[in-house]
Amino acid sequence: MATSSSDRWPIPLKQHIPTLIFITVTVLTSNLVSRTQPTAYLDEIFHIPQAQQFCSALSSTSLFSAQQVWRQLTSVRYDAQLTTPPGMYAISVGMAKVLPGWECKDVVWLRSTNLVLLLTLPVLVARILGQIEEQARIASAAEDYSPSKTITQNLGKEITRHEIEMLQAKAKLQLPPTPSASHDDLAHIEPPTISIAQAALPAPTGSAAPLLRALKQREASAYTMALACTICFLPPLWFFGFLYYTDLASTWLVLAMLSLYNDLNTSNAHVAPTITGLLIALTSILAVAVRQTNIVWIGFAAAQATLSRVGKHVSHTQQGSDPVTQAIGMVKGAFGDNKKGWWTAVAINAAPMVPVLAVCVLFLRWNGSIVLGEKAAHQVALHLPQMGYFVAFALGFGLFPLLFSLQSMSHKAQDQGPSSSTLATFTHSVRSAVSALIDSTIASPGCILALAAALAGFYIAVDRFTIEHAYMLADNRHYTFYIWRKYRSSYAIPALDGMTIEPKLAVVPLFALALIAWSRALTHHAVNKRTGALFSLLFWMATAAVLVPTPLIEPRYFLMAYLLLRIYSHPYAPCEKQEKSAQLKWIYLALEAATYAAVNVITVGLFVNRPFQWPSHAVDVSRNEHTTMRFLW
């Protein structure tokens, strides 16, 4: 097999180059933002003073003394304007206790809480990407496995380097046959036959695999790290890593909990399931303490882990491509021959949620609402257009990942010859993506019906359920203020006298097509194909549960849903397909990174170089708010 130039001339630790670039750019930008805006800005005027109170109260208190900690916490007056619990402040206090020299009373140090979380986020994302890729590889091998298919029966088939390495690793775990006294001619002893699928499956419990080999297998590739860093470079997410907002802490904890759920459902995990379950419970409680709506994402993580695990008990004859058929297969699995394994999987994934659910019930009973503080400005509403705004946000920032995902589903994706130029390969892949989208919308009566339902649903949503929040209409520091002014206006069509067009209705087809495209990508690239449609439905239900009750439109609210959409819609193809599309996946990733870089340069440039003034009567002088304002998400 031909060896790539990178294999002939390897770069030492090349998988860490994307991380080093990400860290360098992030730290330099953080320093620039702090020098430009050294005082608390916008929501920081609420968060920073509150965090400073907790830091002062616990500065000389040992965290191991629960009684002293509780006494000091109850002495702190909580700001009535804050609508989120004090989880982020607990993280800052914890860092001040653990890290030497850390001062959590200063603005720069408090902002560094999010900076630390942002710098470590690519490692966490890469871990999740690796877990999903491993699950997809095992699921693909299990789907293709047949006892009659062995390596000796497929000598004419090209075997990739990765498959050879898997076979070698598996063969080292097999004991060689021991010759008897009457059969001491080793030439007549046939070696054990191992199929590719068997090599892909986890090693049996108790196998003594060397530690170094296990660590090497867990090491992320250069592409995985580049992908993780690019995902964390998402402009709204990356920007709020430089301010003291709750978004980074919320995102980090939800992803950590998701990674732990993946560990809980891995047969070859290195940590006992009981310990993993306890870690999930603690992480979930802290995630809800940072932002209340994270309870939805905790439920999503538990449900998707359960779905992936119990999907293995669904037989091939019960699987289908629509959620109804898959749901019927799941119900049959719950009461079929494998019902014990089915309910065991449900119990394993539901148990870690019990503590956080108990905490949430106590909180609701004490507070009377999911919102803390100023409840009047955050009333629950039926804001159905939020789903349209989200898919538009996802399409804007995820256009190239979506195209890459769609083109991999098309049968035309691999038609180009190996000698094609880079531009020709990319152009062909875009055509394949468009072809896949067309197939998803008009290829069958069911697809046409789904498109019609999406169009009708979004039209009713934007026509009858559009909400204009007072904060969005009055605060000219946010980009949504300027976008909404264009969105809510009517524009006359010069060629048609007297006719106007409303942008909110004109974008309805875009909303519908984006929803169908992302749903198709989620379903097709689900780890377990037998439950892919159910997984897609589960994701959209969780997203709606978070966004629809929210009357305010903010890109920050879309971050968690988009990160999960980006991670789970990525093509985790078998290794041979990855080798054929290696060039293409780097092209799409480079385009995504370039888009993010351009947006980040513009937004940071506006924040630093384009300040503007508010009148003194419009600022909160009691909170030391300054009249100099800056643009941000």
Curated annotation (Swiss-Prot):
Its main location: endoplasmic reticulum. Its EC number is 2.4.1.256. GO terms for molecular function: dolichyl pyrophosphate Glc2Man9GlcNAc2 alpha-1,2-glucosyltransferase activity. Keywords: Endoplasmic reticulum, Glycoprotein, Glycosyltransferase, Membrane, Transferase, Transmembrane, Transmembrane helix. Pfam families: DIE2_ALG10. GO terms for cellular component: endoplasmic reticulum; endoplasmic reticulum membrane. It is found in: Endoplasmic reticulum membrane. It catalyses: an alpha-D-Glc-(1->3)-alpha-D-Glc-(1->3)-alpha-D-Man-(1->2)-alpha-D-Man-(1->2)-alpha-D-Man-(1->3)-[alpha-D-Man-(1->2)-alpha-D-Man-(1->3)-[alpha-D-Man-(1->2)-alpha-D-Man-(1->6)]-alpha-D-Man-(1->6)]-beta-D-Man-(1->4)-beta-D-GlcNAc-(1->4)-alpha-D-GlcNAc-diphospho-di-trans,poly-cis-dolichol + a di-trans,poly-cis-dolichyl beta-D-glucosyl phosphate = a alpha-D-Glc-(1->2)-alpha-D-Glc-(1->3)-alpha-D-Glc-(1->3)-alpha-D-Man-(1->2)-alpha-D-Man-(1->2)-alpha-D-Man-(1->3)-[alpha-D-Man-(1->2)-alpha-D-Man-(1->3)-[alpha-D-Man-(1->2)-alpha-D-Man-(1->6)]-alpha-D-Man-(1->6)]-beta-D-Man-(1->4)-beta-D-GlcNAc-(1->4)-alpha-D-GlcNAc-diphospho-di-trans,poly-cis-dolichol + a di-trans,poly-cis-dolichyl phosphate + H(+). One of its GO terms (biological process) is protein N-linked glycosylation. It is a multi-pass membrane protein. The chain crosses the membrane at residues 9-29, 112-132, 192-212, 225-245, 270-290, 344-364, 384-404, 442-462, 498-518, 533-553, 587-607. Coiled coil: none annotated. Glycans are attached at N265, N367. Pathway: Protein modification; protein glycosylation. Dol-P-Glc:Glc(2)Man(9)GlcNAc(2)-PP-Dol alpha-1,2-glucosyltransferase that operates in the biosynthetic pathway of dolichol-linked oligosaccharides, the glycan precursors employed in protein asparagine (N)-glycosylation. The assembly of dolichol-linked oligosaccharides begins on the cytosolic side of the endoplasmic reticulum membrane and finishes in its lumen. The sequential addition of sugars to dolichol pyrophosphate produces dolichol-linked oligosaccharides containing fourteen sugars, including two GlcNAcs, nine mannoses and three glucoses. Belongs to the ALG10 glucosyltransferase family. This is Dol-P-Glc:Glc(2)Man(9)GlcNAc(2)-PP-Dol alpha-1,2-glucosyltransferase.
